[in-house]
Amino acid sequence: MEPIPINAPDSVRNLKLLQWVRETAELCQPDSVCWCDGSVEEYDRLCNEMVASGTFIKLSEQKRPNSYLCRSDPSDVARVEDRTFICSIRRQDAGPTNNWVAPKEMKATLNKLLAGCMKGRTMYIIPFSMGPLGSHIAHIGVEITDSPYVVTNMRIMTRMGRAVLDLLDEEAEFVPCLHSVGAPLEPGQQDVPWPCNDTKYIVHFPEERSIVSYGSGYGGNALLGKKCFALRIASSMARDEGWLAEHMLILGVESPEGEKDYVAAAFPSACGKTNFAMMIPPGEMEGWKITTVGDDIAWIKQGKDGRLYAINPEYGFFGVAPGTSEKSNPNAMATLHANCIFTNVALTPDGDVWWEGMTDTPPDFLIDWQGKPWVPGCERPAAHPNARFTAPAHQCPVIDENWENPDGVPISAFIFGGRRGDTIPLVYQSANWYYGVYLAATMGSEKTAAAAGKIGDVRRDPFAMLPFCGYHMGDYFNHWLHVGRTLTDPPRIFGVNWFRKDENGKFLWPGFGENMRVLKWIIGRVHGRAAAVESPLGWMPRYESLDWRGLDGFTRDKFSTLMSVDREAWKQELFSHEELLEKLYDRLPKEFTHIRELMLSTLWRSPEHWELAPERYTAEH
């Protein structure tokens, strides 16, 4: 059999890359090989080819210029955590929160599946940079794929193409990412709009710094720069090299006086991360501005001044569409005006898109995400609950001026929070870095109707990284503690909970843009200006410490309820941490045991129901 020509451009100098491409072509047997240059012409050509093949639908140029709708196979609509593997050399290094198979065994399985898997298809080679080109915080990857959907989405989500190849000299390191939909075509066989395979594997080899994904064309499983590289592999790199790869938004906060701070925040899914990253402050808080650096992932390295600096390694937003509206996130809606790819949303008769929550009243008629006619009241969603938009980040009207700064932005505070209807107060500042790491390690959200288990049960999601940490979670906690010890000026750590409810099940806090009031207090604490009260959990704002302009109906009593600490509920909360901590026991930081005991001791000494009012239990700072 003749070797498949790889047609490498003359500019490709990296010997490891050339060897890997040759080996992959021999294994996967594509009909042709295409080196992606990242040009507009290439993007337009691939989009037009997918329109012709039925994969893409061109949206109205008047309503949504240069944008496309794609419908996936109904079996391929989300990340598949049960088919996601961390194949470290030693099982114990993957830890109990990850699926593990021995690397040798997994490679044998994958090689059988990959043999001939690209027959009848084009093999695309996508050189991409996670982070601004040339940044000391950035890292380069190369994805090989047989999916033009992946190529077009990667052009929006990463800096990709010829400029990245130019950075890869003979010896430069890169992360190899191999992806196939696992649907070879025999000569003359008709393709389907969304090829995929029932057998799926998303596999990470942390010591080799490599990724293989087979069988799925969906975003998180196929856009390998995102969760696979930017979190699972990068978190393993970060542990070895002394930095942090985190599932965090990054935003800028500017005061009326022009003082600028940057904050990174981690929330589990369905807790409003993108909304927070693009928040619009209440009109009464004139002069305060929020800018967006990133909405999903942060790579954070130490600067020469002993502070932490973060970049958003991505170049676009891959957001959940349902629930996004002019009311909940007007900046996201403005970002979606053009040049986007929409996956599994509904199509309107006039060639635009729609999803649940976009408007109060749905249109009279739609074509749903499966291509079927849809009318209001037909008892099925028009858009899939995990429908997505892929949008260029530079289109965001509040994108931060430093979002592409190769040195990153200095982080003043970390914020952690889950969705909790009781127990957890609106906001509190941890006593120190160690308490803050414990706070983040034990955070969680109540299970919703969509998740297995009893509604109201708390699913622990440490640092919002449970599905994304590429090594043992106990080692991850230790790594955070170690990073804190090396900093001369560490960010302050805060816990928040926008979702506490009253006795009638109604949210106590209005959320959305009103969260700016809490953020203003956090920034005040960072600079030592805002007053706080010592509580059993850490430092909390007094009623007078928050800016209430424009929220006149929010009474002192309501705020007191929102901030209260119930001794019995918190004892149960601390005892409930045991399930997660026991699972990680052999590698759990010893500090955690002491912190838990100290918190219990503080609770024993506090009143049965701690509130902000009683002066004898408070100390102003």
Swiss-Prot record:
Classification via Gene3D superfamilies: 3.90.228.20, Phosphoenolpyruvate Carboxykinase, domain 1 (3.40.449.10), Phosphoenolpyruvate Carboxykinase, domain 2 (2.170.8.10)
Reaction equation(s) it catalyzes: oxaloacetate + GTP = phosphoenolpyruvate + GDP + CO2
- Sites binding GTP sit at A270, C271, G272, K273, T274, N275, R388, R419, F512, G513, E514, N515
**Entry binding sites for substrate:** R79, Y218, G219, G220, S269, N386, A387, R388
Q: Which domain of life is it from?
A: Bacteria
Q: What is its EC number?
A: 4.1.1.32
Q: In its keyword annotation, does this UniProt entry include Plastid?
A: no
Alphabetized CDD domains for the sequence: PEPCK_GTP
**Catalytic residue list:** C271
* Keywords in alphabetical order: Cytoplasm, Decarboxylase, Gluconeogenesis, GTP-binding, Lyase, Manganese, Metal-binding, Nucleotide-binding
MF terms from GO for this chain are:
GTP binding; manganese ion binding; phosphoenolpyruvate carboxykinase (GTP) activity
Main location, first listed in the record: cytoplasm
User: What NCBIfam families does the entry give?
Assistant: PRK04210.1
Subunit comment: Monomer.
Q: What is this protein called?
A: Phosphoenolpyruvate carboxykinase [GTP]
State the organism named in the record.
Answer: Chlorobaculum tepidum (strain ATCC 49652 / DSM 12025 / NBRC 103806 / TLS)
Q: Highest lineage ranks of the organism?
A: Bacteria, Pseudomonadati, Chlorobiota, Chlorobiia, Chlorobiales
Gene symbol here is pckG
